[in-house]
Amino acid sequence: MNGNWIDIKTSDDTKFQGYLSVPDCGTGPGLIIGQEIFGVNKTMRQIADYFAEEGYVVLVPDMFWRLKERVELAYNEVDFKTAFGYFGKFNLDLAVEDISLSMDKLKTLDECTGGVGYMGFCLGGKLAYLTASKLEPEVAISFYGVGIPEML
């Protein structure tokens, strides 16, 4: 399974990117995957590729693009500090807009033949809660979403 990066256009014609992975059969329902605070790193891309192998058209948008494009951090002490630095500057409202744009982008792709769901990890898990409450995904799943109780 080989994914590639695609452009996602914003309302002001700015672009950000997301990692797209398509099943071998070429089509399937859509799935947005929300990244951890470590960016669209190897782990997030492997998860996308796994779900593509299961038949989904998967898009992992770069949620840190306004701070730095294509952040890719490892799970070590130095990168943890860097990740929390990005997290501290992160704008949740703009992120939900980016998820909406990502969902719209996925729906326009010929490969996406069904509805679009959202699944997020860590920061992406928090965004799953916001996506479910503000957008209309077919399903929203949060894995170890941070800070959700404080938003209730």
Regions found by a protein language model. Name each.
Residues 1-152:
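N-terminal cap/leader regions of alpha/beta-hydrolase-fold enzymes
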